[in-house]
């Protein structure tokens, strides 16, 4: 984008990244928001339980997985991170309504902030999309995108065919302008 004024660059950046404020971002693209507040640092023995629960879920041993998640949540009941993980296991078990309840609680506990909160918003947004509840999905993806999630931003673009078409056309034009 050599030869473009700062104003032109700001307009192009806004077109390619519609959730970015007008002008260049203060943060590098790879920046993902993390929470400086207490991020549910789990005791090592609770982390071990969660890891075992995840392995069981991946092996489709759901009964044991959910027993382990319940045990972990008994020891850390306010952990949005554990709720996120259990929601993912519930989705693998095709128990979407229960997963949605865990994600609601994870968002409430985290207030949608920090790594666990953003992950809960993204997971809930994806689940809403799966359930054909696009308005709810969009709300969650907007919140997560504003918090810095590039995944949420990509989902918003994917949900807006007009924006995706415009972005594709602009990329083609700029690639042709920069030459082979």
Language-model features: where?
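Alpha-helical tetratricopeptide repeat
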Residues: 1-180
């Amino acid at each position: 984008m050599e030869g473009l004024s700062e104003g032109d660059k700001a307009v192009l950046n806004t077109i390619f990244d519609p959730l970015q404020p007008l002008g260049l971002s203060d943060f590098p693209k790879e920046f993902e928001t993390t929470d400086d507040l207490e991020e549910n640092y789990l005791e090592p023995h609770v982390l071990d339980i969660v890891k075992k629960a995840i392995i069981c879920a991946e092996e489709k041993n759901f009964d044991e997985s959910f027993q382990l998640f319940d045990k972990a949540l008994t020891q850390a009941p306010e952990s949005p991170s554990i709720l996120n993980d259990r929601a993912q296991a519930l989705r693998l078990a095709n128990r979407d309504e229960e997963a949605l309840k865990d994600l609601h609680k994870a968002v409430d506990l985290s207030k949608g902030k920090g790594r666990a909160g953003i992950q809960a918003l993204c997971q809930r947004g994806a689940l809403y999309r799966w359930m054909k509840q696009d308005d709810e999905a969009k709300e969650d993806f907007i919140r997560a995108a504003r918090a810095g999630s590039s995944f949420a931003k990509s989902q918003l673009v994917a949900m807006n065919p007009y924006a995706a078409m415009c972005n594709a056309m602009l990329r083609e034009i700029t690639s042709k302008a920069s030459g082979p």
